[in-house]
Design a protein with these regions (language model features):
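Extracytoplasmic ligand-binding site segments that recognize negatively charged/polar headgroups
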Residues: 41-54, 66-81, 89-225
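A ligand-binding cleft/hinge motif common to bilobed small-molecule-binding domains
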Residues: 100-104, 227-245
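A bilobed periplasmic-binding-protein/Venus flytrap-type ligand-binding module shared by bacterial periplasmic
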Residues: 146-151, 188-189, 258-273, 289-290
Length: 341
């Protein structure tokens, strides 16, 4: 039964790792080329960035067509659950921003066990995320305060998370929704841990504009519809680099780290292409593309973009998997009680 509350004791206590399939890259690649296709359900990044990744994979392996299904984490998860309920094998690789999804699917046997060759090059902070060897971190991101640089001076921009609660930002704040976005859900759990639910009761008094994805905040800042927000460093910096009025602050009380895994479905219709794609997501090309998108590399030896801060220079709040598994369902209900949606 895919319930997150019953998962918590398993996550907290850990599980013995069963035998994991090891990578035979030459054989996998040959078989993947024969399969010729892969379907990727992903909540990682925005749609444009996800398409860049899919195109890079196809450029390297022209025989393999990538069908990209990009949406928010909760929507992708519900679609996958519906597939499973109906006996439909469509998704090959599942990439969520909510670790609770990965834990639930792993515990229910929906993920294949696989040990990617490229997993050995993960940074130490990202090693061993799943001792059972089914999902691996393929992307990381930070959520920080962002602002419209045409309407807010740097000196006046929020310097910490409680600064978003200042009454001067009433009707000027934008956030995503934890019932749609795993990134937003993780951020909400982190804020509750730091400041209690009172943080969101005070935020509600500022009448925020609530989107779905964490990326929505960047769009409404860029348009000037709102002028401060909780947003992702990646899309924020890409948008700013294109000459748009989006700035960010590394908050004094810590950016929120989002660790986003990918896993191969046990019923993947293209299992070898899925393994090859998982290797690609953990490999140097995807690491470079992630860094070019101003996201945090999970692979060792990947340089950050000029002007971007390396993670060891940033104060970071990182939740445990158990905190995310237990916390996101709780804050979704609290959010609906407070914000009415």
């Amino acid at each position: 039964m895919l319930t997150r509350r019953t998962l918590f004791p398993l996550v907290a206590g850990g599980l013995l790792a069963p035998r994991i399939a090891r990578a035979d890259l030459a054989g996998i690649e040959a078989a993947a080329r024969k399969e010729g296709a892969i379907t990727w359900y992903t909540a990682h990044t925005d749609g444009e960035s996800a398409q860049i990744v899919a195109d890079a994979f196809t450029q390297r392996y022209p025989e393999i067509k990538v069908t990209l299904i990009r949406t928010t984490a909760q929507v992708a998860y519900q679609r996958l659950l519906q597939d499973l309920k109906n006996g439909i094998a469509q998704c090959d690789v599942f990439s969520s921003t909510d670790l609770g999804h990965d834990e639930a699917l792993r515990a229910d046997g929906k993920f294949a066990k696989y040990a990617p060759e490229n997993a050995k090059d993960l940074l130490p902070a990202f090693q061993g995320l799943d001792p059972a060897g089914t999902y691996y971190p393929t992307l990381s991101e930070l959520v920080v305060p962002i602002y419209n640089t045409a309407k807010v001076k740097p000196a006046d921009a929020p310097k910490s998370w409680p600064d978003l609660l200042d009454p001067k930002w009433r009707n000027q704040v934008a956030v995503g929704h934890p019932a749609y976005s795993g990134t937003v859900g993780t951020w909400v759990v982190a804020m509750r841990k730091l400041y209690g639910w009172e943080y969101f009761e005070k935020l509600e008094a500022n009448r925020p504009l609530i989107g779905r994805s964490v990326n929505d905040a960047v769009g409404v800042l860029n348009s000037g519809e709102r002028i401060v927000a909780a947003g992702p460093i990646g899309l924020s910096q890409v948008t700013a680099a294109r000459g748009n009025p989006v700035g960010l602050v590394y908050p004094s009380d810590g950016a929120v780290l989002i660790v986003s895994p990918s896993a191969i479905m046990a019923n993947a219709p293209h299992p070898n292409a899925a393994r090859l794609f998982e290797e690609f997501l953990l490999g140097p090309t995807h690491a470079r593309l992630s860094a070019e998108g101003y996201r945090l590399p999970v692979r060792a030896g990947t340089p950050v973009q000029p002007g971007a801060k390396p993670v060891d220079e940033i104060k970071v709040n990182r939740l445990t998997t158990a905190e995310i598994v237990q916390g996101i369902p709780e804050v979704i209900e609290q959010w609906r009680d407070t914000f009415g949606s």
